[in-house]
Amino acid sequence: MDARYNPPAIESKWQAHWRELGLDRTPELTAESRKFYALSMFPYPSGSLHMGHVRNYTITDVIARHKRMQGYAVLHPMGWDAFGLPAENAAIDRGIPPAKWTYQNIAQMRDQLQRLGLSYDWEREITTCAPDYYKWTQWLFLQFFKAGLAYQKEAPVNWDPVDQTVLANEQVDAEGRSWRSGALVEKRLLKQWFLKITAYADQLLADLEKLSGWPERVLTMQENWIGQSVGARVVFKTETGEELPVFTTRPDTLWGATFMVLAPEHPLVEKLTTPEQEVAVKAYRAEAAARSEIERSAEDREKTGVWTGSYAINPVNQERIPIWIADYVLMGYGTGAIMAVPAHDQRDFEFARQFGLPIKLVVQPPQGGVTSAEDLQAAWTGEGVLINSGPLNGIPVGKGPGQSVERAIAWLEEQGLGERQVNYRLRDWLISRQRYWGCPIPIIHCPHCGIVPVPEEDLPVLLPEDVELTGRGGSPLAQLEDWVKVKCPACGADARRETDTMDTFICSSWYFLRFSDPRNDREIFRKDLVNAWLPVDQYVGGIEHAILHLLYSRFFTKVLRDLGLLNFDEPFSRLLTQGMVQARTYYNPNKSGKDRWIPTALVKDPNDPRDPETGEPLQVIYATMSKSKGNGVDPEEVLANYGADTARMFILFKAPPEKDLEWDDADVEGQFRFLNRVWRQVYEFVVRGSGTESLQGKAAELLQAKVEAGSLTKAERDLRRAVHTAIKEVSEDLEEYQFNTAIAGLMKLSNALAEAEIPDSPVYAEGIRTLVLLLAPFAPHMAEELWQALGGTDSVHRQAWPTYDPAALVADTVTIVVQVNGKLRGSFEAPADVTPQEQERLALQSEAAQRYLQGMTPKRVIVVPKKLVNLVV
């Protein structure tokens, strides 16, 4: 064993040895196995790891390593979410085929992951852009299609009129312009493929109650995204006989509806527009088409709209009300039509004031002072009683039994004017992408048969390789006539392939299932294997995936359960959302945009940071690492300077996993010093010649004999108590994922060993051995090297996790606090079995009592057994 800790040498040595040994290979499950499936959200292969990756994967790796040592059969895989727009953009910008760019990045990132000492079973690696994976993505699409859960309909897309192509939302800037051409983006209707996730909305909502191992914050985000609302469906008829159904959560305010508003995309707009209003309506619809849904929904935006020229009849009071169109109403939510109640809805109130529309009060506020709409400065949305509401006058406003909403629904149903309805904010999942680098949709369009699924035996539908990507001219696949032209599988006629590819979220919605049987080329997975390994016991990933990825994965799991492939209905038992990695960040408040952020490398003096261009003083904050802020820390530099084990220890020690972590070079150095200290402790133990003995032979036997005979010295009992306290506390902290306090426990044990003056005792040998075993999940390379130096014949990672001896935790003495008139004045040690009477006697004899009493006799003595004595004078 070398006297000096040399991370590069030992880390590369053990990584190679572990690969050769197959140390991280997933074991076969048996009837006796306790399984544990640990999974990090797999990455997009961008080409290089960032510190957020390192934190995520280190957390999961510690959990996996700990579980292995506890005797679990552990599945801990890694793969690549490899389809997506960045590869296509790289192909356009650099002239590199997306596949080549992607696989180069995968090779680079795989190497980085291996150098971090992450215990992945690389034999189970999957890549979503590989045909042997996307064959089964296509197979799943066909199962959804057969079950009526995949369908095609027209939907609006972002259209670049210059490049003649569809843009993803992230390719449209804040001003509504294309990121590439700069053209103002238009909304166009195209036929798109959808998955019917709304069919599972009620289950997705109800089953959130089963997820006790998920953060409450994530459950709330999913609940809000699904967005269940209970109300009524009411049909308004136009004067020309057209029906306009609306969904409202406030049917009790129907008597206050003074106009209707339709989304500009509503299919009845053209029919309802009178000749006099045709020009204005057409112009407004064109303006609305250029705006994003986020922009249209902004509450602080000035309301715009135009009258269609038509009227509807309010079904509850037969009043004639005008029909408007406005972009704050979205076609994608509800029916695309609303009844506007300006007195009691703020958006409707602002719209009515903007265009001089009538406002009718139907809720009387409880405090009075508001008797008509003229008294309102804003919509009244609080409690009160109904007025001007016909049969519902005087009913208290609320959603409870006997209150206004329930009474209104009951009345509407009695009158045949409406019915109770449950609505969801959740919309069906639009999965079509007019892109090349995605999973082809296995559908053929036949002029005679219509939509025909590709036969399963013809899967996968392979992506063609000879494609020129320009970013212009619509779907790249649609331009490849040789690929598009195909015979109809049903009738043999000339037909055409579907040229859309799938949303990449499809690929990540089932990958965790494939890891159970990743090399199966006959079926998507063996049912016995997937149902044995799943659900995932611990899933780790960023809060940014709290909604879409997790919701889609839950949806897929429930569908596959209903198809008879799975016997569970939730994919992830426990979820840990790790915090962000932040770093010291400099910005100039006198600048704007990207220019305000000053890269760390350009700041000469961190103690007096100044703008390198202007000399102005800079402000300093901690912000999430990013290229735009120039505050990133390259994992490669940390590995080169300190090694993987130090990087892991810092990340785990600096903050609890769910909290944001502030990068600090001094703290990295601190962890490096701690590992050096442990190295020296083991080195000095080994060079004394007792290393091998500590694991086998005399030392262990001698310790057992001394424990059984009760012949341990006080120093040995104290050290053994520290050793077994560390086992207990580190084990408990690991179960709760409190990695920072677990490492603090390792430091306490190291301190106890350093302070113990019994280096030749078998208790000291037990302490050294225990320290190395407890260190193994956190600093795996160093622990392996130290274990071998101590005489280990097998890997430290194949050892049983230490268990503590409860008897060793019992203290010989207890510390008794001495108070005088309730104020702390001192303390003393007493036997652990001290009686209250003896405790009082010892307290009166203590140095603290003698000093403060000065011969006086206390009026009272209060004894808290084995804790304190309070002397009242």
UniProtKB/Swiss-Prot annotation:
Enzyme's top EC category: ligase
What positions does the record give for the motif labelled 'HIGH' region? Answer: 43-53
Looking up SUPFAM superfamilies in the UniProt record yields:
Anticodon-binding domain of a subclass of class I aminoacyl-tRNA synthetases, Nucleotidylyl transferase, ValRS/IleRS/LeuRS editing domain
Superkingdom, natural source = Bacteria
Return the CDD domains for the record. Anticodon_Ia_Leu_BEm (cd07958), LeuRS_core (cd00812)
Select a single GO molecular function from the record's annotations and give it. leucine-tRNA ligase activity
Report the GO terms under cellular component.
cytosol
Q: Residue numbers of motif 'KMSKS' region?
A: 624-628
Q: According to its UniProt record, where is this protein mainly located?
A: cytoplasm
Amino acids binding ATP: K627
Q: Which InterPro entries is this protein grouped with?
A: aa-tRNA-synth_I_CS, aa-tRNA-synth_Ia, Leu-tRNA-ligase, Leu_tRNA-synth_edit, M/V/L/I-tRNA-synth_anticd-bd, Methionyl/Leucyl_tRNA_Synth, Rossmann-like_a/b/a_fold, tRNAsynth_Ia_anticodon-bd
Compartments, record wording: Cytoplasm
Enzyme Commission identifier(s) = 6.1.1.4
List GO BP terms, alphabetically: leucyl-tRNA aminoacylation
* Assigned keywords, A-Z: Aminoacyl-tRNA synthetase, ATP-binding, Cytoplasm, Ligase, Nucleotide-binding, Protein biosynthesis
Report the catalytic activity. Answer: tRNA(Leu) + L-leucine + ATP = L-leucyl-tRNA(Leu) + AMP + diphosphate
Q: Which family does it belong to?
A: Belongs to the class-I aminoacyl-tRNA synthetase family.
Q: Which PANTHER family match?
A: LEUCINE--TRNA LIGASE, MITOCHONDRIAL, LEUCYL-TRNA SYNTHETASE
What this protein is called in its record is Leucine--tRNA ligase
Q: Which organism is it from?
A: Synechococcus sp. (strain JA-3-3Ab)
Instruction: List the top taxonomic levels of the source.
Output: Bacteria, Bacillati, Cyanobacteriota, Cyanophyceae, Synechococcales
Q: Name the gene behind this protein.
A: leuS
